From Swiss-Prot:
Quaternary structure annotation from Swiss-Prot or TrEMBL: Part of the 50S ribosomal subunit.
Organism the protein comes from: Lactobacillus delbrueckii subsp. bulgaricus (strain ATCC 11842 / DSM 20081 / BCRC 10696 / JCM 1002 / NBRC 13953 / NCIMB 11778 / NCTC 12712 / WDCM 00102 / Lb 14)
InterPro entries: Ribosomal_uL6-like, Ribosomal_uL6-like_a/b-dom_sf, Ribosomal_uL6_a/b-dom, Ribosomal_uL6_bac-type, Ribosomal_uL6_CS
Any single GO CC term annotated in Swiss-Prot or TrEMBL for this entry: cytosolic large ribosomal subunit
Protein's UniProt name: Large ribosomal subunit protein uL6
Gene Ontology biological-process entries: cytoplasmic translation
UniProt keyword rRNA-binding, yes or no: yes
Gene responsible for this protein: rplF
Gene Ontology MF term list: rRNA binding; structural constituent of ribosome
Keywords annotated in UniProt: Ribonucleoprotein, Ribosomal protein, RNA-binding, rRNA-binding
Amino acid sequence: MSRIGLKVINVPESVTVTKNGNEITVKGPKGELTREFDPRIKFEQEDGVIRFSRSNENDKAIHGTMRANLANMIEGVVNGYKKELKLIGVGYRAVAKNNVLTLNVGYSHPVEMKAPEGVTVTTSSATDVTIEGISKQVVGQFAAEIRAVRSPEPYKGKGIRYADEVVRRKEGKTGK
């Protein structure tokens, strides 16, 4: 049984957390994030510590989710989030210009993807893509969308994968 919702969140001095109705805004050195939270969960802030409490046991799941979301928001405005992708395959390459990522991954046409607001896309080499931002959800979602353009296949391992991803390989069919 998870008790994540009961853990307190320590707020760094460089971060301010304000509540306005159901919206919680987190401001930090890297930027500002706002999110609407469920009104069934109570929010208490004192002496740089935030606690969430629920009124009944039926709200356990949303209790832990809200606590994790706020902890991720605080982490994002302090340190930010980063995802790295690798393109593996002959002729596969990526170019980032003006926050538009152009992928050449074996299709008859290049695939262009515009980065969402608050996300920066850079390419350190033709096969390495780095996505950075302050929202864990937006960075992860955009990285997943890029990976879905050409996900790694199990026979040769070609495709777009996360830098730390291990692709399970399959053996090809045997001849007669």
